[in-house]
């Protein structure tokens, strides 16, 4: 049975919020200028702005949890992404360029963590307390390894 060891929220900054809202804002401004020409196009654009905002809201993580057997990245609603300890090879500062699953919530690399995995893409996250996240992961990972060896 899994039990939670540590929980953290993403470290966010104002730049990410602006970047996230920019596509919807551009679509809405364009819709305002087109409403006199075609009401139908304006309604489509408002719907597109709403849909794109909704998608962005659902793909930004809201919580990072360390369990006794996995790391769980939680999103809004019932959505979550699990990283079993069996697949983790290392955790630490991200490399300069990585190809993988990037879930950044800020523009600074100082709070970013890369979770490298065996045979799978690495995952980049940005917890608010990087040191506490890494130390709690290392403790949980060592305890998991000890329990696995028995």
Regions picked out by a protein language model, each given a short descriptive name:
Residues 1-36, 105, 110-120, 133:
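N-terminal membrane-targeting/pre-transmembrane regions
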């Amino acid at each position: 049975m899994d039990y939670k060891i540590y929980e953290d929220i993403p470290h966010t900054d104002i730049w990410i919020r602006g970047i996230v809202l920019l596509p919807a804002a551009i679509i809405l401004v364009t819709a305002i200028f087109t409403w006199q020409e075609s009401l139908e196009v304006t309604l489509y654009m408002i719907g597109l702005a709403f849909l794109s905002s909704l998608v962005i809201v659902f793909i930004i993580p809201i919580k990072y949890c360390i369990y006794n057997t996995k790391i769980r990245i939680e999103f809004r609603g019932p959505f979550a992404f699990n990283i079993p300890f069996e697949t983790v090879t290392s955790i630490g500062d991200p490399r300069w360029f990585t190809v993988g699953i990037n879930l950044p919530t800020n523009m600074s690399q100082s709070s970013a963590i890369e979770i490298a995995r065996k045979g799978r893409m690495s995952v980049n996250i940005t917890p608010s307390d990087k040191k506490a996240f890494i130390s709690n992961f290392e403790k949980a990972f060592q305890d998991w390894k000890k329990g696995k060896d028995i």
